[in-house]
Amino acid sequence: MLTIVPLGGMAGCAEDSASEEGPAEGEGSGGEVEPACGPEVPCALGDTCTEGVCGRGPIHDLLPELPAGQVAEERAEALVAEGMADLPGGRFAVGRPGDLVLRNDRVAFVIQRPHRDGSLTPYGGNVIDAVRLGGGDAGGGDVDELGEVMPVLHIGLTVDFESVRVLNDGSDGGPAAVVAVGRDAIWDTVDLGSLLGRFDLLRFDLNADLPLLVAAVYSLEPGSGTLRASFTLLNEGEEPLETSLGLVVDPRGAVDDFVPGRGHGAVGFDEIFASLPPAPYLAFHGARISYGLLPLHFTSEGAHPPAEGSAVLNLQGITAAVLGKPDILRAVSEPNVTIPAGEAATFGYDLLADATDAADVHEWWLRSTGEESIGMVRGTLTGAAAGAPEGARVAVLDEAGRSVTAAQVVDGGFEVALAAGSYQLRPATRSQGLGESTAVTVEGGGATEDVDLQLPEPAGLAYAVRTRSLGGEERSAACRLSLIGAVPPELELRAAFDPRKDPLPPGHVAVHYSRTCDSADDGPLRVRPGRYLAVISRGPRHSAVQEIVDLEPGETTTIRATLHEVVDTGGYVAMDCHIHTIGSPDSKIEIEAKLLAYLAEDVDFLVSTDHDVLTDLGPAAASMGAEGELSTTVGVESTTFAHGHYIGFPLPIAPDIPTRGAPDWAGGRGPSLTANQLFAALRDLGAEVVQLAHPAGFSGFFARSALTFDLEAGAFGFDTAARTPNEELRLGPGEPFFSDAFDTLEIATGAGGAGPGGRFFGGASDEPGMNDVMRHWFDFLSVGMPAVGVGCSDSHGLVERAPGYARTYLPALGGGGPARPDLGALSATGAAGARHGDVIVTNGPWLSVRGPGGAAPGALVTPDEDGSLEIEVTVEVPTWLAPPDQLEVFANNTYTLPASTPAERAMEPVHEEPLEYEEVPAGDGGVVLRATTIVTLATTQDEDAWVVVRAIGGEPLFPLMPASIEIDLAAETPERFITATEGRPPFAVANPLFVDTNGDGAWVAPLLAGAPSSPF
């Protein structure tokens, strides 16, 4: 642990300033500003009022000194942005007028004005843009692929900077500098207590109010690509303060985390208990730009990296580093600094913003830390006669096989600076894995080693596949190509790439989406030679091509075929209402790539639901020429850590706000919003649909509500003893938590129905993953809560949690253009002309449920005079998929909640029967599997009823969905080539028919009399 003493004074002057409202007015770009002050006009935080004039307060005398100005042509400047022209560009640039800019001829950084929003990094005063200025990119424009960098104190606190202003404008030839002053504040948009607290790991009070005054200084020297940030913490209390110092990075763009000794990829919860080396620095490695972050301690002798390195953890897509700790367990349980009363400690970071690759960052780190024995390795990489493959990298490993760094291959060449020593170099591409290892010995003193590396000769797979509609029209359409076979262990790519960002399913060598399903347009697939099963598909409404291919080195094999539309869902739109793109911190998938996947999986309507930011998919769809094939709307997933995730759509974009108009579920500087308050906030923003996202699980809506259902009383209640108090969830005391003001709930999240990963979500291990949510849903229906069941993917990648599975079918609106759904079918109150609740949830099979007179789900139906109710059920799947083999019908089923025993979990449908299929011609040359049955239910006039139909199977939906597989390379047919087990079985669920048993024209929930009077 480090005890840090007061530091020297700060050179420079306080100049232009910014407020939360916008730019300062009436202040020049040079000379010290001395605003008037008095009892009614206080000075900025950190300043003092002397004889009616504001001046620098004591904390300014504790800040690190800036280097003296230099006489040189190069200059750096600091300014308050008065308009957008003062701000750097880049696709992830979020700076707005009123923010402060530091820039030179290489880079620009934006420091946000005092601000508050609902992002993962909620307060202003931090770096929000790190930009390589134009000319360093093929397009010649500014490049920004980084989100925000924020200090973290006490593991769960940060700083609410109340004052941000220019400290030195750079006109003296020295560093341009900005100073921000604030106090510690709860990091309320990330509640680590709700995650780590359940494991009894934390030793810090995450709601503490520390006696700290904090001053940040951001400085940029002329000609440098590195920003230096320092955070000086003045202990204004009367006792020594033990705390923890750390940093958080939101690497929002197309960059992969890289940690020396571990390689690429986020360090997640599964690695907390692993013996991982601490990080000397962090790199964020991208194809267009890379960033380096070097944590720093400041003492009277200057700035230096922690000798012990830093413990690193990735959480919800953001990267946290705790200084001077070897691992996360010690980081969350031990302080790393003691600040005596009345004294200060300073820590910070250097941020490199114009690196080419991780190797560039590594060299920057070596030189920043004073390494004297540095040599250079230069080389070429070839991949057969065609030269180095696009996107290739060279991984550098030490003698023990640990990752040191990785270099991009540009125009067939690469270079990397290394400390003297022995290393292994391994070339790699994402499709071919790691190549053979080459040993090199690096001499110090600037010596250069030349090496030639070669990747194995790849094989090629070309394809030309057309799609034929039910009406016989043939055209080019998007498709998915999956290549399945024996995967060599060398495809573990962490040394060169992030293999866990969107990992391939078991046995898959490649998954490729094609806009036209023709390699003449996007090139053949290049992979390792071998024997594979190639599967070309276009979602569950079409046939598929399955062909065994023997791919030889240097040769290209071609598949030619036609995909047939075989399932007729006419009048219905396939919707995914829970998807993530690169706008979410835990997704790295470009919008265009995501849209291409949805085109290939044959989904018609998309709701963007990035975490706490609004993303408009429409412009990207238009640029791809896809606006006639799918339609989109804007939504949000409000991602509370403590009590669940909630979706609202459609929403308007607010372009002048960094979150683009997403609600601040953490409540600004007050208590966080309850579910009830958040639903209202989403409505106020314009949401027509409010949705519970994966509501089961240890911190989900159901659990946090402590919702119970008394089967004998037929009533919901709340287990107040089990419910976490509002104060522990950072909610307002006395505020009611539960609300029924939602429209939809995800009865199936993901292809398996259980939610993200299925680890803490969904049903018990002895039942289908969706059953837990369905039990709640059925109980809601029985007491008259109008909740529509939907299915969504919650897709963060292209392969894992695949786009479009589960999906929801709902009625289409009339008119021309791409299919759009009637969102009135999802509204709790319905809409004029809408078939309320005419909704099907599925991970593949098509399910049609029709009551008397052809009534669709959501309709009010009346039994025959003898009380019998006939329901016609049809299930269709293409022949390449395993169909559901069992039909279940539920009517007024109610369950004890929580269901903790097998008996309580028993679903007990009122009717079950096996489904029998026949092959039926479909469209022009296609074949579909179809099962049709008539279910007859006997009703009484004792109570009205709801009826839900579910089709469910036991065999995996492979190859549409991943599965555990066994491969027989000697087999001659696709059926024998792969045996799939333990995959995701098929399911489809129809929303309820409402049965008016006594024919009075009204429907009364069967247990309405037993429903609690409040808050329903």
Where are these regions (language model features)?
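Ser/Thr-rich, Pro/Gly/Ala-heavy low-complexity intrinsically disordered linkers and tails
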Residues: 9-56
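Beta-strand-rich recognition/accessory modules
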Residues: 68-76, 81-83, 89-90, 94-96, ...
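Acidic, contiguous internal or C-terminal segments within carbohydrate-active enzymes
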Residues: 116, 120-133, 178-258
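A short, solvent-exposed beta-strand micro-motif common in secreted/extracellular proteins
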Residues: 323-324, 420-431, 510-515, 528-539
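A short, amphipathic beta-strand motif
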Residues: 375-385, 412, 453, 459-472, ...
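Short, ordered, surface-exposed loop/turn motifs in non-cytosolic proteins
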Residues: 376, 383-409, 468-508, 884
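A metal-dependent hydrolase metal-coordination microenvironment
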Residues: 544, 566-724, 747-750, 770-772, ...
